[in-house]
């Protein structure tokens, strides 16, 4: 519902109130992308050890997987910008205020006479926003973790860009022709990026009913790329057990 010009004014106003502001994607949806602007009251970065402690406490009360938070990367991988990137994005856009409501006048135009699709605006936004993990998170001496998070962010952006060209198809073999290599490329960038792993796993399971050899090849590749996840290995075992 928003064009990038309106978003720049919103970000400008947010950063005026919260100089340490950050942005994250609420979903990876191409049709209805949702960007969240958040800030900490103390203006500090997030400390990785504290984030892990809070996630562990929350997991005692909630099934975090039901909220799409399978691990810390599923949560922290949603961030797309820190303060510096947001300031650069806002540039010299006019601040949206009560007495200068530029968004209220601009936003309807994007709804009634759009000049682009939501997916196109999302991809354009992600291409503008460049942030390093160290700007948002204090990982202590764990440099490898910061590299993994940066790889996750890169994989997320590649996943979103690849999705813009996909056309849904009820035939799993035809669907795999579209998405297999793009999703595998995403997993090679970051094996921890579940939104690429999960659909391939589901399609391999469906494919096993009609083409066991192709399903086995796909599951083997998934298991090689992400051995830390058990699902592909278990599916391979079931497939072997059902072979004549």
Mark where each language-model region is.
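Alpha-helical repeat scaffolds
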Residues: 175-186, 211-223, 244
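Soluble small-group transferase modules, centered on the S-adenosyl donor enzyme superfamily
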Residues: 23-185, 190-195, 199
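TPR/TPR-like alpha-solenoid repeats
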Residues: 164, 203-206, 239-242
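Conserved Class I S-adenosyl-L-methionine
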Residues: 3-25
């Amino acid at each position: 519902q928003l064009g990038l010009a309106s978003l720049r004014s919103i970000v400008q106003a947010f950063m005026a109130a919260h100089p340490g502001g950050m942005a994250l994607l609420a979903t990876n949806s191409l049709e209805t992308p949702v960007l969240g602007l958040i800030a900490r009251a103390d203006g500090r970065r997030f400390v990785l050890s504290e984030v892990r402690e809070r996630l562990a406490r929350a997991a005692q009360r909630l099934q975090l997987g039901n909220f799409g938070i399978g691990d810390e990367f599923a949560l922290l991988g949603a961030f797309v910008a820190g303060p510096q990137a947001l300031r650069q994005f806002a540039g010299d856009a006019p601040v949206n205020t009560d007495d200068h409501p530029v968004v209220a006048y601009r936003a309807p135009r994007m709804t009634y006479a759009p000049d682009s699709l939501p997916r196109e605006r999302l991809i354009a936004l992600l291409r503008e926003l460049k942030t390093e993990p160290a700007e948002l998170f204090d990982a202590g001496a764990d440099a490898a973790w910061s590299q993994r998070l940066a790889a996750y962010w890169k994989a997320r952006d590649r996943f979103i860009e690849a999705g813009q060209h996909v056309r849904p198809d009820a035939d799993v073999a035809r669907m795999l022709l579209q998405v297999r290599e793009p999703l595998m490329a995403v997993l090679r960038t970051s094996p921890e990026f579940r939104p690429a792993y999960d659909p391939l796993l589901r399609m391999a399971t469906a494919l096993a009913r009609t083409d066991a050899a192709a399903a086995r090849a796909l599951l083997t590749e998934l298991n090689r790329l992400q051995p830390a996840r058990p699902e592909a290995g278990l599916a391979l075992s079931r497939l072997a057990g059902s072979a004549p």
